[in-house]
């Protein structure tokens, strides 16, 4: 809230004092209680706003001496990479201002990032992020904090262990085959030998099917039907609309319940989505629990694995549902965005497209051979694909930035940081910094992830792990990072093996023309990614 509760209580106290003790002596209070309260509270509001918006940030800020980006202020949705680049990123901490001169620190030095990552239960996500995303993602691992997050991570990390992810490769490949065949059918139906697809939509459909099958053992048929109920729900609430931005801004200044009660279309969509998603998760959880009680829960999906862990089987139903909604929402959205950017970079770097096609066809079974599946061992034998996807994740991280706030007064690189200061971690910008990646940091180069041009190099040559933040580090690192890499490898391999892919609009051949939705849940092409796909025989 913009005006602290204590300020309003002080106003009430002052009002009572003036009205009942000085009623006849002061003209201002002759209008009695309500008018006096309004006059005093308006004056206090004005003084508080003057202090908060102008005096404190402009005259009394502890950050006045820090370097600033050229414009010093951005709209909420602006990509912080621009500000960091203009504000001499190498210094490590940059001062900027947000809405109503709200102070921000953009942090990029390895020591500051290490402190934020290792002391992550002191540096928490701002409440505004939780209020914006909580209805869709649920209060799971992505949004919970401190002891609650620590307990959840301890419980739900084991089901994402590599041995369980390896068991899911047949599911990843089966759905990759299905979406490839579906796209091929649409191309053949045109009779033109090629077709134009909005890759972001197709990536979201296959990612949703993969995540529901892999995590809950249920196929919702999004690949077969773009209007499948669950697909429509996520398509609606995860679109980067102005309504979502308006709600996010309002929740910074007004109670969340009040904002959610406003008659806005985005509110209605998010409310309906909340009920639908949680209802689906609740039904599937109860179905799995019934199977567990009957001693015939044998699936390899994540939920089945979770329930076979005794510690998780006894967890409250609502907590498990929170984790399921988090996995569904955050998982399928970020992975589909990663796939979308991978296809974009294949269109821009057609030499790599040809190299990857050759590797895929030599390693993986054709999608036409339904009885054969890809395995984790197959993917590990594709160093070019692994290098390419890792560079895509560096170049276009699905979450291009994140924010933190310290719970207590602290220091970063010797700079005093009061509690509640908004700290921006510009993931996309850090991933491209020369201090971490060398002189070719701002060049898309999958070869940095290769040794001798054929052996995969998992470090990519980065000088510090804090120079590569696509999956973060420390207690808040992504528990499903290997899941995401495996799914991306399967889908991209199936597409590049079967299709020749190129942009349908040459305007986007220049990356500067590709605007991204950096103010939403993820950073994806704002206007979609339309790609012309042509079926290539021989696989």
Curated annotation (Swiss-Prot):
Keywords: Antibiotic biosynthesis, Glycoprotein, Heme, Iron, Metal-binding, Monooxygenase, Oxidoreductase, Signal
Single Gene Ontology BP annotation: antibiotic biosynthetic process
Keyword check for Oxidoreductase: yes
Pathway(s) of this molecule: Mycotoxin biosynthesis
Binding residues annotated for heme, in chain numbering: 478
GO MF annotation: an example: oxidoreductase activity, acting on paired donors, with incorporation or reduction of molecular oxygen
EC code: 1.-.-.-
One matching Pfam family: p450
Cofactor(s), by name: heme
Signal peptide positions (record): 1-16
Residues bearing carbohydrate: 120, 520
Keyword match Signal: yes
Entry similarity comment: Belongs to the cytochrome P450 family.
Function: Cytochrome P450 monooxygenase; part of the gene cluster that mediates the biosynthesis of burnettramic acids, an unusual class of bolaamphiphilic pyrrolizidinediones that display potent antibacterial, antifungal, and cytotoxic activities. The first step of the biosynthesis of burnettramic acids is the hydroxylation of proline by the proline hydroxylase buaE to generate 4-hydroxyproline.
Protein known as: Cytochrome P450 monooxygenase buaD
Organism: Petromyces alliaceus (Aspergillus alliaceus)
